[in-house]
Structure formats: C-alpha cells, structure tokens
C-alpha cells in the first residue's frame, strides 16, 4: 500500500500537517475548497520562476492567510515589498474576505525538496535533455545535501517512444510503509512534443520519533 498511496496523505495526523487549516459548515465547505484550488493554481502560475514548493492556506473570520514556501523569497517579495502587494491585490479577486495576509517561508535546501526536484526534472525534459541524465543528476545533488534516500520515476512516451513506459531510479533507502519515516513527495508534469510525461520524486529525510510518548514514559518512571 505504501508504494501506491500519496506519502503526505498517509502521514497526515501522524507526522505531517494539513496544507489547508480551516473549518467550515456544509454550506461553505465546497466554495472554500474551490477557492483554495484556484488560489494554489494562480500562485503557482504567477510565481512559476520562484520555486514554490508548498502553499498553506489558513482561514479565520475575516481574513485569509497564505504561507508560501519558496526557494527564492526575494523574487516573491520584490523591491520594497511591491511583489507581495501586487499578489495581495490579485488574490482579493479569488476570496470574499476583507484581509489577505501573505507569509513567505524560505526553502533552505531546494536540492532536497521533492516538489522542486520534480519540477526541475520536468523542465529538463521539456528542454529535450535525456530523462536518465536528468533523474540521475537530481538524485546525486539530493544525496550530497544529506538526504538518506531518493527515488524518482518518469512515466510517458520517454524519448519519443511509440509505447509509453515508466522508468525509475533510486539511491539509498525509502521506507514508504513506515509512518514515522519523514518522506517528502513531489509530482510534476512535463509538456513535450510527444505528450505529457509525469514525474514523481520521493525523498527520505530520516525518522521523526514520537517525542510526546517518550516524555510521558520518563515522567512515569520518575
């Protein structure tokens, strides 16, 4: 099962958190969900060159807060915060709240971020670089930065082949079944002249141990 399911969804509530943090009644839930989808698509398209890996959306009574995780925060913020202000004005069209707050979070290690790695491979495929070379170089860079394991997969008409297939490469360990394993997952699509090629990346960053349970046991022993 661990090989098929989205690693983030499998670990939500265990070691991962939701990308959308809000509550709604049955009347507003569907409209909020559609708004979230539109916001994510718009921000990803507008900031496509800024390396946006993740967008968290929080909602309160009269405000919407966005936490944008990006590898190039300076490009998003702009001179004197002009980029942020322009983005706020655009986002007001998508939400019916009075305030839109934007918080920029820097992705410090972009070479080991699964989403950015997948997008990087997809961009190379669109430039007609060999998929084997693109995947192997991306894996090597991630392993050099301290990742414990990396797995990449490309699916589609690779190198213009008549029959679509899936090619995978991996290095290190990727324990997808272990819930305490910190697995980062990313997906991107490359639009080539032969059709779309799907790119998936899994990055293993070590285990996250349940610290709360350990603390309780220590207190009981004392």
UniProtKB/Swiss-Prot annotation:
One of its GO terms (biological process) is translation. It holds the Pfam family KH_2. SMART domains: KH. Residues 39-108 form the KH type-2 domain. It comes from the Bacteria. One of its GO terms (cellular component) is cytosolic small ribosomal subunit. GO terms for molecular function: mRNA binding; rRNA binding; structural constituent of ribosome. Part of the 30S ribosomal subunit. Forms a tight complex with proteins S10 and S14. Belongs to the universal ribosomal protein uS3 family. Binds the lower part of the 30S subunit head. Binds mRNA in the 70S ribosome, positioning it for translation. This is Small ribosomal subunit protein uS3. The gene is rpsC.
């Amino acid at each position: 099962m661990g090989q098929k399911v989205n690693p983030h969804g499998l670990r939500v509530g265990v070691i991962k958190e939701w990308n959308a943090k809000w509550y709604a009644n049955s009347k507003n839930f569907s409209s909020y969900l559609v708004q979230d989808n539109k916001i994510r698509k718009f921000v990803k398209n507008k900031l496509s060159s800024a390396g946006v890996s993740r967008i968290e959306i929080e909602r309160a009574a009269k405000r919407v807060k966005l936490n944008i995780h990006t590898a190039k925060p300076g490009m998003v913020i702009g001179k004197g915060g002009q980029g942020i202000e322009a983005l706020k004005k655009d986002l007001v069209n998508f939400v019916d709240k009075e305030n839109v707050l934007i918080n920029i979070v820097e992705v410090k290690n972009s070479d080991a971020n699964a989403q950015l790695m997948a997008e990087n491979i997809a961009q190379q495929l669109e430039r007609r670089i060999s998929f084997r070379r693109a995947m192997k170089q991306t894996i090597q860079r991630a392993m050099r930065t301290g990742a414990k394991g990396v797995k990449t997969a490309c699916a589609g008409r690779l190198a213009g082949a008549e029959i679509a297939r899936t090619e995978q490469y991996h290095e290190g360990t990727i324990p997808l079944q272990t819930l305490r394993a910190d697995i980062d997952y990313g997906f991107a699509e490359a639009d080539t002249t032969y059709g779309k090629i799907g790119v998936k990346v899994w990055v293993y960053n070590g285990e996250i141990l349940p610290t709360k349970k350990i603390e309780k046991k220590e207190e009981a022993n004392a």
